[in-house]
C-alpha cells in the first residue's frame, strides 16, 4: 500500500525514456535503489516513491490522481488526452515543464517505390499505427479519409506483410524505416519528454517538495546546456572575446602573475562552443582555452 504522505512519481520501467528519467532524478539528488524486478522504489533521502510502469499507463495514472507526478513523452500524453476526450471525459493535469531528452517525431511513411504528393495520396488507404488519435486529428485537418490498422509494435513491417498501405510511427534516425523499404514522407507531431502533475488539492509538504524538485531539474538542464570556460586573453581585446560567446554572462577577470597585458577569464556560457569559435578566440590572442562541463547549476 502506498503512503499518501509521500510524493509519488511514475516513470517508464523500460524503454526509450527509462534511463534518462532515472538519470535526471539521480542528478536531482534523489537516491533510489532500483532493482530490476521491483515496480515501486522508495527514495532513501526524501519522502518520494518511484513507480516504474509502462509508458502508456503514466498519463492515466496522473490524470486519475493515482500518482502526483509523471515523466512521459508528449506523444504518449497527447494520444491519451485525445483518447479520453473521444470517450467524453475531461482529463485534468498540469504540464510543469518540457525536459531535454526523449526527442522524437511521429511521421507518416510509405513504401519507397510509391509516389508522394502530399497527405491526399493516403485518401482511402489503410494506415498502420500505434497512435490512432494523433493520426486521425492530423488527417482530419487535411480532409483525408483513411482506414486505421491499430498495432502496438512492429508497425514498420505492416506494408510488407500486407496489413497496411502506409504507417504512422515514431522516427528517430529513419534506419528502421529504410531497413523495411519505407521512407518518411511527413512529420505530423514532434515530441520530447515532459514532467506532468495531477490536478486537485495537494498537501503543502508535497507541493513544497515538487517546487524544490522543479528548481533542481531546472539546474540540471541549465548545467547540461552550459559550459564553464577558462582562458587567458589580451586585456585590450576582452570585448571582442566576449562578443564571440553569445549567451555568456559577464566574465570574471583575474590578473595573471607577471603579466600586465593579459588576464585570466572565467565565464559560464549557455552556447555550445564549437571548434570554429575556439579558433576565432585563438586568433584574437586567447590561449589556454578550457571548456568544462558543469555538473550542477543554480542561478
Swiss-Prot record:
Feedback inhibited by histidine. The keyword Phosphoprotein does not apply. Gene3D superfamilies: 3.30.70.120, Periplasmic binding protein-like II. It catalyses: 1-(5-phospho-beta-D-ribosyl)-ATP + diphosphate = 5-phospho-alpha-D-ribose 1-diphosphate + ATP. It holds the Pfam family HisG_C. Belongs to the ATP phosphoribosyltransferase family. Long subfamily. Equilibrium between an active dimeric form, an inactive hexameric form and higher aggregates. Interconversion between the various forms is largely reversible and is influenced by the natural substrates and inhibitors of the enzyme. Catalyzes the condensation of ATP and 5-phosphoribose 1-diphosphate to form N'-(5'-phosphoribosyl)-ATP (PR-ATP). Has a crucial role in the pathway because the rate of histidine biosynthesis seems to be controlled primarily by regulation of HisG enzymatic activity. This is ATP phosphoribosyltransferase. It comes from Salmonella schwarzengrund (strain CVM19633).
